[in-house]
From Swiss-Prot:
Species in which this protein is naturally found: Jannaschia sp. (strain CCS1)
Designated name of the protein: DNA-directed RNA polymerase subunit alpha
HAMAP family associated with the record: RNApol_bact_RpoA (MF_00059)
Recorded name of the encoding gene: rpoA
Keywords: DNA-directed RNA polymerase, Nucleotidyltransferase, Transcription, Transferase
GO CC, any one term: cytoplasm
UniProt domain comment: The N-terminal domain is essential for RNAP assembly and basal transcription, whereas the C-terminal domain is involved in interaction with transcriptional regulators and with upstream promoter elements.
BP GO terms, sorted: DNA-templated transcription
Segments of this protein annotated with the region Alpha N-terminal domain (alpha-NTD): 1-234
Origin superkingdom: Bacteria
Presence of the UniProt keyword Transferase in the record: yes
Length: 338
C-alpha cells in the first residue's frame, strides 16, 4: 500500500545523553538522524510537553504562627512574610506518593533557616537543602506549617485554597514542573552519503527530582500516548520478515558494524585494531577489557558507552552462540533494519 510510507522514513539510530556540570540536573540529549523537518517538529513538541506536562511536587500552602496574611511581618525575622513565601516557592521536592502531605519548620534565632530545616516525612525528600528561606535574629521563634502536593504545570494560588481553610492559611502558586529550563536546536547531519537529515539537540535542566534523560523519556511517552488515538488501523507485520527475525536468537542490531556508529577516529581505530567488527563483538567486552586495549582511554570508553546506551545496549552483555557461523550473510540480510 503506497500510503504506508512511514515504513520507509528514516528513524533515529542514535540517542546520546551528554551529562552537564551537574549530571543529576543538567544534560544535553542528541538524537539523529531524523527526516528533514522532523527535528523542528519533535523538538517543539518535546519542549512544550517537558515544560507543561510532567508530574512533580511543590509547596501549595503556608501557615506561620502569629501571622494572619502575607502582608505581615514576624518579630525577629529579617524578611517579611511575602519574601518568606517567595523563598518557599524555590524549594525543590521529590514526592514518592500522592499528596497532600503536611510538613513543618521549627527554628529559634539567631540562625539562617534553610530548606534543610523542613521536617522529615515519609515519601518526601527535599533536594536543595541549602536553599535559604529566611534569617532569624537573636530571640526570634519561628514555626511554619507547609502543605506539599503533587501535580503538573503551574497552578495559581486561588486554586490551592481548600474549602475549609483555617484563618492564617496562605495558599501559594505551585510550579510542579520538575523541568526548569529546556531549549532545542536543529542542525543538518548525514546518514551514509546523504546529508539532508536533521540532528536534534535538547538542552535541559531539572530541579533534581527527575533526571534529564528520564524527563525526555516521559515526555516522549506522553506524546506517543496522545497520538495513538489518531491511528485508525492495525499494521500487519510482514510474515516473512517476522519469521526471519524469530529465527534469530539475538537482536538483529548486533549485526551492525561498529564502523557505522560514527565514533571518533581514535575510538574507531582502537576497535579496528582489536578486531572488533560488529556491535555483537563490542558489547561482550567488559569495561576493564576495553581499557586494556592499546591507546583506548576513559574518554573513548565513555563515548562508546553513551552510543550503546542510546541503542538500549551496554558493555559486558552475554550473547549465546556468538558469532553465528554465517555472520556476514546475516549482516547483509538485516542491513535494511539498521
Amino acid at each position: 500500500m503506497i500510503h504506508k510510507n512511514w515504513q520507509e522514513l528514516i528513524k533515529p539510530t542514535q540517542l546520546v545523553v551528554q551529562p552537564g556540570t551537574d549530571p543529576a540536573r543538567k544534560a544535553t540529549v542528541v538524537a539523529e538522524p531524523l527526516e528533514r523537518g522532523f527535528g523542528l517538529t519533535l523538538g517543539n513538541a518535546l519542549r512544550r510537553v517537558l515544560m507543561s506536562s510532567l508530574q512533580g511536587a511543590a509547596i501549595t500552602s503556608v501557615q506561620i504562627d502569629g501571622v494572619l496574611h502575607e502582608f505581615s511581618s514576624v518579630a525577629g525575622v529579617r524578611e517579611d512574610v511575602t519574601d518568606i513565601v517567595l523563598n518557599l516557592k524555590g524549594v525543590a521536592i521529590r514526592m514518592d506518593a500522592e499528596g497532600p502531605k503536611r510538613v513543618s519548620i521549627s527554628a529559634k534565632g539567631p540562625r539562617v533557616v534553610t530548606a534543610g530545616d523542613i521536617s522529615e516525612s515519609a515519601g518526601i525528600d527535599v533536594l536543595n537543602k541549602d536553599h535559604v528561606i529566611c534569617h532569624l535574629d537573636d530571640g526570634a521563634d519561628l514555626y511554619i506549617e507547609l502543605t506539599v502536593n503533587t501535580g503538573k504545570g503551574y497552578v495559581a494560588a486561588d486554586k490551592n485554597r481548600p474549602e475549609d481553610a483555617p484563618i492564617g492559611l496562605m495558599p501559594i502558586d505551585a510550579i510542579y514542573s520538575p523541568v526548569k529550563k529546556v531549549s532545542y536546536d536543529v542542525q543538518p547531519t548525514r546518514e551514509g552519503q546523504v546529508l539532508d537529515y536533521d540532528k536534534l539537540t535538547l538542552k535541559l535542566e531539572t530541579d533534581g527530582s527527575l533526571s534529564p534523560d528520564d524527563a525526555v523519556a516521559y515526555a516522549a511517552r506522553i506524546i506517543q500516548d496522545q497520538l495513538s488515538i489518531f491511528v485508525n488501523f492495525d499494521e500487519p507485520e510482514s510474515a516473512t520478515r517476522q519469521d526471519d527475525e524469530d529465527d534469530l536468537e539475538f537482536n538483529p542490531l548486533l549485526l551492525k558494524k561498529v564502523d557505522e556508529l560514527e565514533l571518533s577516529v581514535r575510538s574507531a581505530n582502537c576497535l579496528k585494531n582489536d578486531n572488533i567488527v560488529y556491535i555483537g563483538d563490542l558489547i561482550q567486552k567488559t569495561e576493564a577489557e576495553m581499557l586494556r586495549t592499546p591507546n583506548f582511554g576513559r574518554k573513548s570508553l565513555n563515548e562508546i558507552k553513551e552510543v550503546l546506551s542510546g541503542m538500549g545496549l551496554h558493555l559486558g552483555m552475554d550473547i549465546v552462540d556468538w558469532p553465528p557461523d554465517n555472520i556476514e550473510e546475516l549482516a547483509k540480510k538485516y542491513e535494511d533494519n539498521f
